[in-house]
Amino acid sequence: RFSKLGVKVIENYGRFIAPNILAAGKYHIAAKRFVIATGSRAFVPDIPGLEDTPYLTNDTIFDLRHQPEHLIIIGGGPIGMEMAQAQCRLGTTVTLIEGAQALGREDLEISSIVLDSLRADGVTIMEDTGVEKIVASGTSNKPAVEIHTSAGKISGTHLLVATGRTANIERLNLSAAGVDVLRPPVGQPYISTDKRLRTTNRKIFAIGDVAGGPQFTHSAGYQAGIVIRNILFKLPAKIDD
């Protein structure tokens, strides 16, 4: 699609080799402005037994060819809730485990309505419940998983890990471009930007999941509009607080 519109598409990983030069395969691209919009991937926590257990993420759950009998979801954020409601309404038994408060970053009045709705649908939501260990006990033909939690053992057929997203920044060699990465004590690393979505290298912008903030498609679209106004129209557009 983009090639037909006249856009040169390079299918390779890009990495900065200088503040104004990006290397991608055999290409070295020098530009006055860059926009980093590399998105994110599912964050997988370090839980004993998880690496030896088949699990799903919101990227892979849509590859299922058969409906899960009992889906256990680790993570009570927006992604976990979305998948829980969808699977439950399709007829799957769903148990959701959250280590703190489910939808804890959302408005309390609104999140309460959402949680009540999911519970009315039949979703079991366990809050303030830590996951201690995961054991895979089934076969490829008959999957089974056992979750050891602070509230006891939970058994199911499938496991979905929905503990957030982490920005795709590792391969970019951002230090060569003078772009700072923020590493908060809680949460995943992301690129530091100002209100105009400029990084610490003012010639490089970052939008979407890599820039922190709400990780939603509509948020990235809004940020793209801010960057376009800054780069193409020379307008000092800023994101709203």
Where do the PLM segments sit?
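Glycine/serine-rich phosphate-binding loop and adjoining beta1-alpha1 elements at the start
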Residues: 2, 7-8, 15-19, 23-54, ...
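General small-molecule cofactor/ligand-binding pocket signal
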Residues: 8-10, 56, 124-126
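A conserved short coil-to-beta-strand element within the FAD-binding core of flavoproteins
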Residues: 10-21, 43, 127-142
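Short hydrophobic core segments
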Residues: 14, 29-39, 73-74, 94, ...
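Glycine/Thr-rich phosphate-binding loops of Rossmann-like dinucleotide-binding domains
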Residues: 31, 44-46, 81-83, 104-105, ...
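FAD-site-proximal beta/loop scaffold in flavoenzymes
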Residues: 51-67, 154, 158-235
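Rossmann-like dinucleotide-binding cores of NAD(P)H-dependent redox enzymes
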Residues: 62-63, 68-72, 78-141, 146, ...
